[in-house]
Each structure stands twice: as structure tokens, then as C-alpha cells.
């Protein structure tokens, strides 16, 4: 089975590097599935998840805060502000961040940065979804 190298990196660190048979991410215009021999492409990514199917068939879930996806003939590069693997998510901290963002949005005042609160809510929601998907996978 053919593969494509996948690199997921942030400004601070390399988060993942490996061979993949499929990389799925959410671009500005919707879901993208990148397989080996995909046409070159560059697009912005929405906060959401990136799912990498490795050469061994394992699916790895990453929750991202948004970024850029670049596809070249031999490599997919995902440049992100932040990314976290589903199994590394601190559920209690994420739930607290989500509740705080929801509270800020519900009680909007002059000092509330609505865009920041919406971004925080989106990131927390994505992380909780990634965690739930990991739990479902482990049950099977």
C-alpha cells in the first residue's frame, strides 16, 4: 500500500511525523481527505481535528486550533498554532475552559473579547470530541 509522509508541527515542536495512508482535516471549505499522490494544495484549516491513518492502519486523532495544510507530492505538512493528541487531553481542564467560554459568551459585556471566547469554545469542543472518539475506539 502506498503512503505519504505526514508532518504535524507547531512553532514549539514537532507533534507527529510518520507515514500515512490517509490524512483527514477540516479546511475552510469543508473536509479534506489527503491520500498518496494527491494534487498539490495549500489551504487554511479551521479549528477541529486531524485524523491520520498510519501505514499500519492505526488512526491517530489530533485536536488543532487551526492552521495551514500543505500537500506536496511526497509529504503532507500540517502547520498549527497548537495541537494535542486525543489521549493527552486533560478532560477536566478542557471542560472548565469550555464552561468559561460559554459563560463569557452568555454574559457579553464591553470587556469580553467575543472572537477569543468563540475560539476557546471551538477548541474545547473539538478536544472533547476527539476524546470521545478515542473512548469509542478503545471500547471496540
From Swiss-Prot:
Presence of the UniProt keyword Protein biosynthesis in the record: no
Membrane-related topology note: Peripheral membrane protein
Predominant place of localization: membrane
Name of a matching Pfam family: ATP-synt_DE_N
GO biological process terms, semicolon-separated: proton motive force-driven ATP synthesis
GO molecular function annotations of the record: ATP binding; proton-transporting ATP synthase activity, rotational mechanism
Protein location: Cell inner membrane
CDD domains, per the entry: F1-ATPase_delta
Superkingdom, natural source: Bacteria
Transport keyword on record: yes
Cross-referenced InterPro entries: ATP_F1_dsu/esu_C_sf, ATP_synth_F1_dsu/esu, ATP_synth_F1_dsu/esu_N, ATP_synth_F1_esu_C, ATPsynth_dsu/esu_N
Cellular component terms per the entry's GO annotation: plasma membrane; proton-transporting ATP synthase complex
Keyword annotations of the record: ATP synthesis, Cell inner membrane, Cell membrane, CF(1), Hydrogen ion transport, Ion transport, Membrane, Transport
Subunit structure: F-type ATPases have 2 components, CF(1) - the catalytic core - and CF(0) - the membrane proton channel. CF(1) has five subunits: alpha(3), beta(3), gamma(1), delta(1), epsilon(1). CF(0) has three main subunits: a, b and c.
Record PANTHER family: ATP SYNTHASE DELTA/EPSILON CHAIN, ATP SYNTHASE EPSILON CHAIN, CHLOROPLASTIC
Similarity comment: family membership: Belongs to the ATPase epsilon chain family.
Annotated HAMAP family: ATP_synth_epsil_bac
Annotated function: Produces ATP from ADP in the presence of a proton gradient across the membrane.
Name recorded for this polypeptide: ATP synthase epsilon chain
Native source organism of the sequence: Xanthomonas campestris pv. campestris (strain ATCC 33913 / DSM 3586 / NCPPB 528 / LMG 568 / P 25)
